[in-house]
Amino acid sequence: MDTREINGFASAARSISLPTQPNYSSKPVQEALKHLASINLRELCNEAKVERCRATRDLASCGRFVNYVLNPCGHASLCTECCQRCDVCPICRSTLPKFGDRLRLRLYYECVEAGLISRTHEEASQDSDEDEHQLAADVHRLYSLFDVAMNNNLISVVCHYITNVCMDETAVSSDPVIAFLLDEVVVKDWVKRTFRSTLAELQEIYNLETKEMQAWLDKLLRCSKQVAGICSVLEVMESAFKGSVSPQLQDVQTLRENIGKTKQHLDIMVWCIRHGFLDDVRSRYSNFTSWNALVGERKSNAVKRAWPDAVDQSSDCSVQSASLFIEDALENLEREPEYSQEIGADLEVGRLQKDKRSFLRSKIEGTSGSYPFENLRTAADMLFLHGGSDLVVAKQAIFLYYLFDRHWTTPEKYWKHTIDDFAATFGITRHSLLESFVFYLLDDHSEEALQEACRILPEICGPETYPKVAQVLLERDNPETALMVLRWSGRDGVSELVSIGEAVTALRVRVECGLLSEAFTYQRTLCLKVKENNLKNGAVKHASDDLDIWSWTEWMEILVNEFCCLSIRRNLVDRIIELPWNPDEEKYLHRCLLDSATDDPSSAVGSLLVVFYLQRYRYIQAYQVDLRLQKIEEAFVSDNQIGEEVMFRMRSQSHWRKELVDRAIDILPVIQQQQVRSGQFSEMEDASEGAKKSDLPDAPDMITSSVPFATTNSVFLQSANNARAREPVANNGSPFQPGHMIGNASHDLSHGRLFTNANRGQKSEVRSVTKNLKFGEMSTPFKDLNRARGNSQLQGKRTEESSPEVNVDRYIENNMSSPYLRRITANNPVTVKSSSNHLNGSSQKPESTFFGTRMQPDKDNFVDLDDPMDMSSSLKDNNNNVLATESRNNSGGLRWRSDETSDDEDELTSFGSMPVKGRRRRRFAAR
């Protein structure tokens, strides 16, 4: 049947025809296919060549077409008539048998008789008498045999023809026609011819309506098999050229790329046609305009919630390149290269695209501007006709994202079976299915979508988890889940080097969860890992995002600055100054805290920087910082109008800071005191300091010179992991519950503010591990002051910090219904003693923490004295410290806290301060 009438649309389908199918149960068809499958491939050229009878008749050659070969020798040299009167083969002179079958039908004519090759092709080949047309006829007959092999699941015949004949250097012939048929160019031309005809058929079918296309599904499936066959042929041909650089190889690769995209697009079109392009499945969007507006709103929310870029600080309001997951995925789809002139425009897969406007829109607005797709057909065309064919998995994931976006929030009974069928059709695993779903949910700015994503994440997190997942969770104020994602994906350590962006995200997550000691250990260990890698490779080089190159000192600067800025934002400066910073890290800590004090002199950050040096018995540097802070405060007061309360706080801070610094200077020898107070201290060394002195002048914004790495306390480096392992990480099985707090406690903080006030009426208790060192009855930051053993390295004493943002107990109670939290609770063996164990009549003093007021832990809950982060061992022999003795003579006074409140403040009124003109903006000010 040449034409078909489909649902009354005879004119639309008239140009599309289905070839008459042979009767595969008949013996001639079976014999022909068996002969084709078992033939010696070197004889395939001889079978395809047009032969004429070589017998002489009346002193001339017979010249008739030869349809048979001689049985003894297999030469096609005699026609049927001449075979009856000749006794020998004209070619090899072998004797013909006198009895039995002398002739056997040639393979080509055997296929014609069986109906595998149309007789019109056979007649056309015999009508060509001229030499140039005769060569074309021979090639056409070989193509016909290839077509028979392709249409009958014998494409391996063509593949073996390439490897065993075309690529065999011994396969040669003196016959120019046979020599031409032995060349691989013939096979490549056959692939182009077949692909061209397939494109024409597909284009006609794709232009039909949905109902019409459904009637041609059988034809589409047959085309899919053909395209898959010629694609496998090109793979074999490409492997034969492997290792060589030639135009032929480039031509084959380009052709294979086009055929691969056609196959992928054809498969997705078959699925869409089967489901009627989901015309019967209602979308949750009323129209395309509303959908497009919602995607724009998602993009706007992503920009608003994006964190500042810790790497690129070129602008005041520098933020990370905020983007949605769908935008990143579309950007990764590479555009196809320019086609060579040899292939021709008739081989471009763009012919199959129905609507050219969507492609032009993506060219104008960028790749990400093509989303959302107007309909299912546009989605199939945009994804599978463009971009590399090797990105088929990513394209399928984007298609799933589109389906989830189109139908989520509607009843699952209407669309879930469609998603499941898509996954089953294309072999998509449940993990990949849920991953696409999570990407959509994290792009959706609704709280419902975020909760659903948090419920699914435990099932799909692993080593291959996209690093941006943790970043987006952090941006959406869910650092606890982000931390779990890092742990589940194996990125909570530094076993492997990561990009600088991933490292910053991991640091931010830990700080936001209150894990300051873990964040500090992470940045320290990572920088050492980068330095070791630089030395091992013999070059200060590490490839990160977009192939940027960073030295280990630049890694340290970025991570330490980020750590300090986050601590300032969360009012945790009083905790980070107690960490064991090495001299290289101190340089960036000093700069960051001093910049913060310059931007906001009314805060306690500058005073805490003085405390940082006093705790390390580096009195001269504390004196220098105090002098600089006094100048900054004087300039701030003179240039701005500030409230009385802010003025009182600043004066109190300055008074007590100066008094403590003066007392510290009094400890120095008299000669040094005179030199310091006379300003002759620039070339002096602090005799009580064993560590390297950090530079006090302003350093440039980006330190590019290589800073020598100072040897740090090896005990800390060796025991960092053990100390972290000893820290309780869960309460009732949750990884978010902190361990016992040791050192200065913090308070509940308001999220999103750079500097916030503490809870009204709440006093912070600052305690030492052993309470061996006391400065009178007043509360001062020097309660934890201790002298390091033999050097100025501060040995930290904190075992675990907890998030001041989230009440963990309340978080667990509200979220224990989630299945992944229940699983963690069941599997986590770590438990923490409940605070209810403390009796009401206990003599223990309540400890103020950012989780509320609780009793101080029992003695058996204290940190082991051998812990390198424990400060108590260094305090045992310092009860008679001069500073402590002098401090006991004072009563009352201002107590510096990171929340910027004094003990006497019952109610606080916020006073806005005018910005200082001409002052350089710091990166943390943009937070």
From Swiss-Prot:
Q: What class of enzyme is it?
A: transferase
Known EC number(s)?
2.3.2.27
Name the source's superkingdom. Answer: Eukaryota
* Keywords from the named record: Cytoplasm, Metal-binding, Nucleus, Sensory transduction, Transferase, Ubl conjugation pathway, Zinc, Zinc-finger
Induction info reads: Rapid and transient reduction of expression in response to brief cold treatment. After recovery, the level is maintained until 2 days after cold treatment, before declining again.
Q: What happens when the gene is disrupted?
A: Early flowering, and insensitivity to ambient temperature and to intermittent cold, but normal responses to vernalization and gibberellic acid.
**Reactions catalysed:** S-ubiquitinyl-[E2 ubiquitin-conjugating enzyme]-L-cysteine + [acceptor protein]-L-lysine = [E2 ubiquitin-conjugating enzyme]-L-cysteine + N(6)-ubiquitinyl-[acceptor protein]-L-lysine
Summed up, the tissue specificity of this protein is: Ubiquitously expressed with higher levels in leaf vasculature, roots and root tips.
Q: Which GO terms describe its biological process?
A: negative regulation of DNA-templated transcription; protein ubiquitination; response to cold; vegetative to reproductive phase transition of meristem
> Basic and acidic residues bias: where?
797-806
Zn finger regions (RING-type) covering which residues? Answer: 53-93
A GO cellular component entry from the record: cytoplasm
What is the predominant subcellular site recorded for this chain?
nucleus
- What InterPro entries does UniProt report for this protein, alphabetically? ELYS_dom, HOS1, Znf_RING/FYVE/PHD
Question: What does the record's miscellaneous section state?
Answer: Loss-of-function mutation (hos1) in the gene shows an early flowering phenotype due to a constitutive vernalization and a reduced freezing tolerance without cold acclimation.
Describe its assembly. Interacts with SCRM/ICE1, FLK and MSI4/FVE.
The text the record gives for the protein's domains is: The RING domain is required for E3 ubiquitin ligase activity.
Q: What is this protein called?
A: E3 ubiquitin-protein ligase HOS1
Organism of origin = Arabidopsis thaliana
Gene name? HOS1
